From Swiss-Prot:
Pfam families: AIRS, AIRS_C
Species, as recorded: Geobacillus sp. (strain WCH70)
Name of the protein in question: Phosphoribosylformylglycinamidine cyclo-ligase
EC number: 6.3.3.1
InterPro entries hit by this protein: PurM-like_C_dom (IPR010918), PurM-like_C_sf (IPR036676), PurM-like_N (IPR016188), PurM-like_N_sf (IPR036921), PurM_cligase (IPR004733)
Molecular function terms, GO-annotated: ATP binding; phosphoribosylamine-glycine ligase activity; phosphoribosylformylglycinamidine cyclo-ligase activity
Domain of life from the UniProt record: Bacteria
Any one Gene Ontology BP term: adenine biosynthetic process
Length: 346
């Protein structure tokens, strides 16, 4: 039976080997609340020891998108999993959640055990950084659906928060300050446009260093998404964070309004933080307007926090103590939308 399945394109033995290779990576993510081992039908997590009075579960799911195409071209698969975790846990921490556990889904044209193990290593690295356990997943070999050397990765995170400490944005008011946390480059959004600019318009090579970059283009494009969970959870224990926005697809223009109450908007001080050079390269080669860049990419800010104006300096100081690069980037204003002040948006 296994041989007949193999002739149809599904190698069961390769799947077993992949599971064996990934076990060491999964094990390092374990938390004491995990009651199940790798290979069960479902993952089990005991909430009873966490001590919440009114626990609220917060979940998020996401994938890596067409950034995967760069990984295929570079034959580099050990950081894509970090991206997958980051996209999920950053989305739930903005509501005040501590990530508890994570599950992944990998679909591929051909199960190459060593490649699957590399992907899972990245997922496990991301889980360790976020403090959550990798309690389950699925690797689906799907010949005819994907090319042999291609795959897709998605994930699902579940976190918990005390009901009274949920971060909803409802307390935000005009005059509150906006603090931005530095990104690690492009992160995981906008890669369909990135690939169009790089390969179709500018015809750039991934192994070359282009001004103003300091590393080969492929290395720059594969930099993993920053995971902000631990510093944000730490800061929330000391200060009231009124709202948070994970800057993903849609950039500043779409994501900052998602945390704001109706009738309020944001004024951003253009030039108040350093914009990574990769965005200058993409703007130049893609012949894009600066405003367009801010509606697509994170432009060097991966997370935005809304705090009382009196809390600016202590919050930034604490974030910097935790290793974050934090900037006062603007303020909340009356009137909806995102506007820019202080520089030419050319």
């Amino acid at each position: 039976m296994a041989e007949a399945y193999k002739q149809a394109g599904v190698d069961i033995e390769a799947g077993y080997k992949a599971v064996s290779l990934m076990k060491q990576h999964v094990q390092k993510t374990m938390r004491p609340e995990v009651l199940s081992g790798l290979g069960g039908f479902g993952g089990m997590f005991d909430l009873s020891s966490l001590g919440y009075r009114e626990p609220v579960l917060i979940s998020g799911t996401d994938g890596v998108g067409t950034k995967l195409k760069i990984a295929f071209m570079m034959d580099c698969h050990d950081t894509i999993g970090i991206d997958c975790v980051a996209m999920c846990v950053n989305d739930i921490v903005v509501q005040g959640a501590e990530p508890l556990f994570f599950l992944d889904y990998i679909a591929c044209g051909k199960a190459i055990p060593e490649k699957i193990a590399q992907i899972v290593k990245g997922i496990a690295d991301g889980c360790v950084e976020a403090g959550c356990a990798l309690i389950g997943g699925e690797t689906a070999e799907m010949p005819g659906m994907y090319d042999e050397n291609e795959y897709d990765v998605a994930g699902f995170a579940v976190g918990i928060a005390e009901k009274s400490k949920l971060v909803t944005g409802s307390a935000i008011q005009a005059g509150d300050a906006l603090i931005g946390l530095a990104s690690n480059g492009i992160h995981s959004n906008g890669y369909s446009l990135v690939r169009r600019i790089v390969f179709e318009q500018a015809k750039l090579a991934l192994d070359r260093v282009y001004e103003p970059l300091s590393v080969p283009l492929g290395e720059e494009l594969l930099k993993p998404t920053r995971i902000y969970v631990k510093p944000l959870l730490n800061v929330m224990k000391q200060f009231e964070i009124k709202g948070m926005a994970h800057i993903t697809g849609g950039g500043f223009i779409e994501n900052i309004p998602r945390m704001l109450p109706k009738g309020l908007g944001a004024e951003i001080d253009y030039g108040s933080w350093p914009i990574p050079p990769v965005f200058d390269l993409l703007q130049e080669k893609g012949n894009l307007l600066r405003h367009d860049m801010f509606s697509i990419f994170n432009m060097g800010i991966g997370m935005v926090l809304a705090v009382d104006s009196e809390m600016i300096h202590p919050v930034i100081a604490r974030l910097e103590e935790l290793g974050e690069k934090a900037y006062l980037i603007g303020r909340v204003k009356q009137g909806e939308g995102v506007s820019f002040a202080g520089g030419a948006m050319s």
